[in-house]
Amino acid sequence: MLLMIDNYDSFTYNIVQYFGELNQDVKVVRNDQVTLEDIERWQPKYLVVGPGPCSPTEAGISIPAIHHFAGRIPLLGVCLGHQAIGQAFGGNIIRAKTVMHGRLSDMYHTDKGIFSNLPSPFSATRYHSLVIEQESLPECLEVTCWTNQNDGSIEEIMGVKHKTLPVEGVQFHPESILSQHGHQIFKNFLEIYA
Protein backbone atom coordinates (compact mmCIF):
# COMPACT_ATOMS: atom_id res chain seq x y z
CA MET A 1 0.00 0.00 0.00
CA LEU A 2 1.14 3.54 -0.79
CA LEU A 3 0.24 6.08 1.88
CA MET A 4 -0.43 9.62 0.68
CA ILE A 5 -0.35 12.47 3.21
CA ASP A 6 -2.88 15.01 1.97
CA ASN A 7 -1.84 18.55 2.87
CA TYR A 8 -5.25 19.91 1.86
CA ASP A 9 -4.35 20.47 -1.79
CA SER A 10 -6.54 20.24 -4.88
CA PHE A 11 -3.82 18.23 -6.69
CA THR A 12 -3.82 15.39 -4.15
CA TYR A 13 -6.23 13.19 -6.06
CA ASN A 14 -4.42 13.78 -9.36
CA ILE A 15 -1.37 12.21 -7.70
CA VAL A 16 -3.55 9.42 -6.30
CA GLN A 17 -4.93 8.77 -9.79
CA TYR A 18 -1.42 8.60 -11.32
CA PHE A 19 -0.29 6.09 -8.70
CA GLY A 20 -3.52 4.14 -9.19
CA GLU A 21 -2.75 3.93 -12.91
CA LEU A 22 0.61 2.45 -11.84
CA ASN A 23 -1.26 -0.33 -9.99
CA GLN A 24 -0.78 1.07 -6.49
CA ASP A 25 -3.32 0.65 -3.71
CA VAL A 26 -3.34 4.21 -2.34
CA LYS A 27 -4.59 5.23 1.11
CA VAL A 28 -5.07 8.99 1.59
CA VAL A 29 -4.91 10.63 5.01
CA ARG A 30 -5.17 14.29 5.96
CA ASN A 31 -2.09 15.79 7.61
CA ASP A 32 -3.97 16.54 10.83
CA GLN A 33 -6.02 13.34 11.04
CA VAL A 34 -3.29 10.71 11.37
CA THR A 35 -0.61 9.78 13.89
CA LEU A 36 2.81 8.19 13.49
CA GLU A 37 1.35 5.18 15.29
CA ASP A 38 -1.40 4.90 12.66
CA ILE A 39 1.20 4.89 9.90
CA GLU A 40 3.27 2.28 11.75
CA ARG A 41 0.19 0.07 12.10
CA TRP A 42 -0.70 0.34 8.40
CA GLN A 43 2.85 -0.60 7.32
CA PRO A 44 2.83 1.20 3.95
CA LYS A 45 5.33 0.15 1.30
CA TYR A 46 5.74 3.79 0.18
CA LEU A 47 5.04 7.19 1.73
CA VAL A 48 4.19 10.26 -0.37
CA VAL A 49 4.02 13.70 1.26
CA GLY A 50 1.80 15.76 -0.99
CA PRO A 51 1.47 19.38 -2.00
CA GLY A 52 -0.40 22.00 -0.05
CA PRO A 53 -1.09 25.72 0.35
CA CYS A 54 1.05 26.36 3.45
CA SER A 55 4.65 26.12 4.63
CA PRO A 56 6.21 22.86 5.85
CA THR A 57 5.93 24.08 9.46
CA GLU A 58 2.14 24.29 9.02
CA ALA A 59 1.82 20.92 7.25
CA GLY A 60 0.65 18.83 10.21
CA ILE A 61 2.38 15.47 10.48
CA SER A 62 4.46 15.92 7.31
CA ILE A 63 7.81 16.81 8.94
CA PRO A 64 7.38 14.40 11.90
CA ALA A 65 6.56 11.62 9.40
CA ILE A 66 9.70 12.40 7.38
CA HIS A 67 11.82 12.37 10.55
CA HIS A 68 10.29 9.10 11.73
CA PHE A 69 10.09 7.11 8.49
CA ALA A 70 13.09 8.31 6.43
CA GLY A 71 15.24 5.26 5.89
CA ARG A 72 12.43 2.90 6.88
CA ILE A 73 9.93 3.53 4.06
CA PRO A 74 10.74 4.95 0.60
CA LEU A 75 9.56 8.55 0.72
CA LEU A 76 8.60 11.00 -2.03
CA GLY A 77 7.72 14.65 -1.47
CA VAL A 78 5.78 16.69 -4.04
CA CYS A 79 5.88 20.52 -3.89
CA LEU A 80 5.16 21.22 -0.20
CA GLY A 81 6.31 17.65 0.50
CA HIS A 82 9.61 18.44 -1.24
CA GLN A 83 10.01 21.57 0.90
CA ALA A 84 9.20 19.50 4.00
CA ILE A 85 12.04 17.12 3.11
CA GLY A 86 14.42 20.07 2.83
CA GLN A 87 13.32 21.49 6.17
CA ALA A 88 13.22 18.12 7.95
CA PHE A 89 16.89 17.56 7.16
CA GLY A 90 17.93 21.08 8.22
CA GLY A 91 17.46 23.35 5.21
CA ASN A 92 15.72 26.72 5.14
CA ILE A 93 12.54 27.35 3.17
CA ILE A 94 12.46 30.80 1.58
CA ARG A 95 10.34 32.83 -0.82
CA ALA A 96 10.89 31.92 -4.46
CA LYS A 97 12.32 34.58 -6.76
CA THR A 98 9.01 34.55 -8.62
CA VAL A 99 5.63 33.21 -7.54
CA MET A 100 4.80 30.39 -9.92
CA HIS A 101 1.15 29.42 -10.17
CA GLY A 102 0.37 27.29 -13.19
CA ARG A 103 3.51 28.27 -15.08
CA LEU A 104 5.72 26.00 -17.14
CA SER A 105 9.49 25.86 -16.71
CA ASP A 106 12.28 23.80 -18.21
CA MET A 107 13.60 21.23 -15.73
CA TYR A 108 17.28 20.30 -15.93
CA HIS A 109 18.41 17.24 -14.02
CA THR A 110 21.22 14.83 -13.16
CA ASP A 111 19.59 11.70 -14.64
CA LYS A 112 19.68 10.19 -11.13
CA GLY A 113 16.94 8.59 -9.06
CA ILE A 114 13.43 9.47 -10.17
CA PHE A 115 14.86 11.45 -13.11
CA SER A 116 16.64 8.41 -14.59
CA ASN A 117 16.29 8.05 -18.36
CA LEU A 118 14.35 11.30 -18.83
CA PRO A 119 15.31 13.98 -21.35
CA SER A 120 16.95 17.10 -19.93
CA PRO A 121 15.43 19.57 -20.02
CA PHE A 122 11.76 18.68 -19.95
CA SER A 123 8.80 20.95 -19.29
CA ALA A 124 6.90 20.86 -15.97
CA THR A 125 4.21 22.88 -14.24
CA ARG A 126 5.01 24.86 -11.11
CA TYR A 127 2.58 26.01 -8.41
CA HIS A 128 4.59 27.47 -5.54
CA SER A 129 5.87 30.58 -3.82
CA LEU A 130 8.43 28.86 -1.55
CA VAL A 131 11.62 26.90 -2.33
CA ILE A 132 14.48 25.16 -0.53
CA GLU A 133 17.27 27.70 -0.09
CA GLN A 134 20.37 26.64 -2.04
CA GLU A 135 22.81 28.06 0.53
CA SER A 136 21.34 26.03 3.39
CA LEU A 137 20.79 22.76 1.50
CA PRO A 138 21.73 20.05 4.00
CA GLU A 139 24.89 18.08 3.23
CA CYS A 140 22.86 14.84 3.20
CA LEU A 141 20.76 16.05 0.24
CA GLU A 142 21.89 16.48 -3.35
CA VAL A 143 20.21 18.61 -6.00
CA THR A 144 18.84 16.36 -8.74
CA CYS A 145 16.69 18.87 -10.67
CA TRP A 146 16.73 22.63 -11.12
CA THR A 147 15.75 25.59 -13.26
CA ASN A 148 18.53 27.51 -15.02
CA GLN A 149 19.43 31.18 -14.93
CA ASN A 150 20.45 32.84 -18.20
CA ASP A 151 24.13 32.07 -17.49
CA GLY A 152 23.37 28.36 -17.02
CA SER A 153 23.74 28.37 -13.23
CA ILE A 154 21.07 26.96 -10.92
CA GLU A 155 18.18 29.38 -10.47
CA GLU A 156 16.06 27.34 -8.05
CA ILE A 157 16.11 23.79 -6.72
CA MET A 158 13.40 21.64 -8.32
CA GLY A 159 14.44 18.21 -7.05
CA VAL A 160 16.45 16.68 -4.21
CA LYS A 161 17.61 13.19 -3.31
CA HIS A 162 18.98 11.98 0.00
CA LYS A 163 22.52 10.68 -0.46
CA THR A 164 22.02 7.48 1.54
CA LEU A 165 18.28 7.06 2.27
CA PRO A 166 15.37 6.30 -0.12
CA VAL A 167 14.05 9.88 0.02
CA GLU A 168 13.41 12.16 -2.96
CA GLY A 169 11.45 15.34 -3.59
CA VAL A 170 10.20 17.41 -6.51
CA GLN A 171 9.18 21.06 -6.30
CA PHE A 172 7.08 20.99 -9.47
CA HIS A 173 3.90 18.99 -10.10
CA PRO A 174 4.55 15.79 -12.12
CA GLU A 175 0.81 15.06 -12.02
CA SER A 176 -0.17 18.30 -13.77
CA ILE A 177 -1.59 17.70 -17.24
CA LEU A 178 1.00 20.07 -18.77
CA SER A 179 3.99 18.43 -17.08
CA GLN A 180 5.98 16.07 -19.26
CA HIS A 181 7.03 12.62 -17.99
CA GLY A 182 4.95 12.74 -14.80
CA HIS A 183 3.93 9.08 -14.97
CA GLN A 184 7.53 8.08 -15.61
CA ILE A 185 8.79 10.05 -12.59
CA PHE A 186 6.30 8.26 -10.32
CA LYS A 187 7.04 4.91 -12.00
CA ASN A 188 10.78 5.46 -11.44
CA PHE A 189 10.10 6.11 -7.75
CA LEU A 190 8.17 2.85 -7.41
CA GLU A 191 10.71 0.79 -9.34
CA ILE A 192 13.90 2.22 -7.84
CA TYR A 193 12.65 1.83 -4.28
CA ALA A 194 10.69 -1.43 -4.69
UniProtKB/Swiss-Prot annotation:
Gene3D superfamilies named in the record: 3.40.50.880
Q: Does the keyword Amino-acid biosynthesis apply?
A: yes
Query: Could you tell me which residue ranges the Glutamine amidotransferase type-1 domain spans?
Result: 1-194
Q: Which InterPro entries match?
A: Anth_synth/Amidotransfase (IPR050472), Class_I_gatase-like (IPR029062), GATASE (IPR017926), TrpG/PapA_dom (IPR006221)
Q: In which pathway does it act?
A: Amino-acid biosynthesis; L-tryptophan biosynthesis; L-tryptophan from chorismate: step 1/5
Q: Which UniProt keywords apply?
A: Amino-acid biosynthesis, Aromatic amino acid biosynthesis, Glutamine amidotransferase, Lyase, Tryptophan biosynthesis
SUPFAM superfamilies under this entry?
A: Class I glutamine amidotransferase-like (SSF52317)
CDD domains under this entry? GATase1_Anthranilate_Synthase
The record places the active site at: 79, 173, 175
E.C. designation(s): 4.1.3.27
Q: Which reaction does it catalyse?
A: chorismate + L-glutamine = anthranilate + pyruvate + L-glutamate + H(+)
Write out the residues that bind L-glutamine. 52-54, 83, 129-130
The protein's matches in NCBIfam families, at most eight in alphabetical order, are given as: trpG_papA (TIGR00566)
Protein's UniProt name:
Anthranilate synthase component 2
Organism from which the protein derives: Acinetobacter baylyi (strain ATCC 33305 / BD413 / ADP1)
